[in-house]
UniProtKB/Swiss-Prot annotation:
Protein name in UniProt: UPF0297 protein CPE1779
Pfam families per the UniProt record, alphabetical: IreB (PF06135)
InterPro entries for this protein: IreB
Lineage of origin: Bacteria, Bacillati, Bacillota, Clostridia, Eubacteriales
Stated family: Belongs to the UPF0297 family.
UniProt organism field: Clostridium perfringens (strain 13 / Type A)
Protein backbone atom coordinates (compact mmCIF):
# COMPACT_ATOMS: atom_id res chain seq x y z
CA UNK A 1 0.00 0.00 0.00
CA UNK A 2 1.35 3.39 -0.96
CA UNK A 3 1.79 6.29 1.43
CA UNK A 4 1.28 8.76 -1.41
CA UNK A 5 -1.67 10.91 -0.38
CA UNK A 6 -1.61 13.02 -3.56
CA UNK A 7 -3.75 10.57 -5.51
CA UNK A 8 -7.31 9.48 -4.96
CA UNK A 9 -7.79 5.76 -4.45
CA UNK A 10 -10.74 4.09 -6.10
CA UNK A 11 -12.60 1.15 -4.70
CA UNK A 12 -14.66 -1.02 -7.03
CA UNK A 13 -17.17 -3.06 -5.10
CA UNK A 14 -19.16 -4.19 -8.14
CA UNK A 15 -17.43 -7.61 -8.14
CA UNK A 16 -18.20 -8.03 -4.45
CA UNK A 17 -21.85 -7.11 -5.09
CA UNK A 18 -22.00 -9.57 -7.99
CA UNK A 19 -20.54 -12.31 -5.79
CA UNK A 20 -22.96 -11.51 -2.96
CA UNK A 21 -25.95 -11.57 -5.31
CA UNK A 22 -24.88 -14.89 -6.80
CA UNK A 23 -24.29 -16.40 -3.37
CA UNK A 24 -27.66 -15.28 -2.03
CA UNK A 25 -29.55 -16.42 -5.14
CA UNK A 26 -27.81 -19.80 -5.00
CA UNK A 27 -28.73 -20.26 -1.33
CA UNK A 28 -32.33 -19.19 -1.96
CA UNK A 29 -32.57 -21.46 -5.01
CA UNK A 30 -31.27 -24.44 -3.03
CA UNK A 31 -33.65 -23.78 -0.13
CA UNK A 32 -36.64 -23.57 -2.48
CA UNK A 33 -35.59 -26.78 -4.22
CA UNK A 34 -35.09 -28.62 -0.91
CA UNK A 35 -38.63 -27.68 0.12
CA UNK A 36 -40.02 -29.05 -3.16
CA UNK A 37 -40.80 -25.77 -4.91
CA UNK A 38 -39.88 -24.85 -8.47
CA UNK A 39 -37.13 -22.33 -7.61
CA UNK A 40 -37.23 -20.47 -10.92
CA UNK A 41 -40.99 -19.95 -10.77
CA UNK A 42 -40.83 -18.80 -7.16
CA UNK A 43 -38.00 -16.35 -7.83
CA UNK A 44 -39.80 -14.95 -10.87
CA UNK A 45 -42.94 -14.50 -8.77
CA UNK A 46 -40.94 -12.63 -6.15
CA UNK A 47 -39.12 -10.44 -8.67
CA UNK A 48 -42.31 -9.48 -10.49
CA UNK A 49 -44.53 -8.90 -7.47
CA UNK A 50 -42.12 -7.94 -4.71
CA UNK A 51 -44.07 -10.29 -2.43
CA UNK A 52 -41.51 -12.08 -0.23
CA UNK A 53 -43.94 -14.92 0.52
CA UNK A 54 -42.92 -16.45 -2.80
CA UNK A 55 -39.67 -17.31 -1.01
CA UNK A 56 -39.58 -19.93 1.73
CA UNK A 57 -38.43 -19.10 5.25
CA UNK A 58 -36.48 -22.37 5.23
CA UNK A 59 -32.77 -21.77 5.95
CA UNK A 60 -33.49 -18.04 6.25
CA UNK A 61 -33.95 -17.77 2.48
CA UNK A 62 -36.62 -15.07 2.69
CA UNK A 63 -34.46 -12.87 4.90
CA UNK A 64 -31.48 -13.43 2.61
CA UNK A 65 -33.26 -12.44 -0.59
CA UNK A 66 -34.63 -9.32 1.07
CA UNK A 67 -31.06 -8.11 1.66
CA UNK A 68 -30.95 -7.37 -2.07
CA UNK A 69 -33.01 -4.89 -4.04
CA UNK A 70 -35.07 -6.57 -6.76
CA UNK A 71 -33.66 -4.28 -9.44
CA UNK A 72 -30.13 -5.22 -8.39
CA UNK A 73 -31.01 -8.91 -8.68
CA UNK A 74 -32.46 -8.36 -12.14
CA UNK A 75 -29.42 -6.35 -13.21
CA UNK A 76 -27.04 -9.15 -12.19
CA UNK A 77 -29.22 -11.87 -13.73
CA UNK A 78 -29.42 -10.02 -17.05
CA UNK A 79 -25.70 -9.26 -17.09
CA UNK A 80 -24.94 -12.90 -16.34
CA UNK A 81 -27.39 -14.15 -18.96
CA UNK A 82 -25.93 -11.87 -21.61
CA UNK A 83 -22.39 -12.51 -20.32
CA UNK A 84 -21.73 -8.81 -19.84
CA UNK A 85 -19.13 -7.70 -17.32
Amino acid sequence: MSNNFDHTMQFDFSKNKEDLTKSILTDVYNSLKEKGYNPVNQLVGYLISGDPTYITNYNGARALVRKLERDEILEEVIKSYLEIK
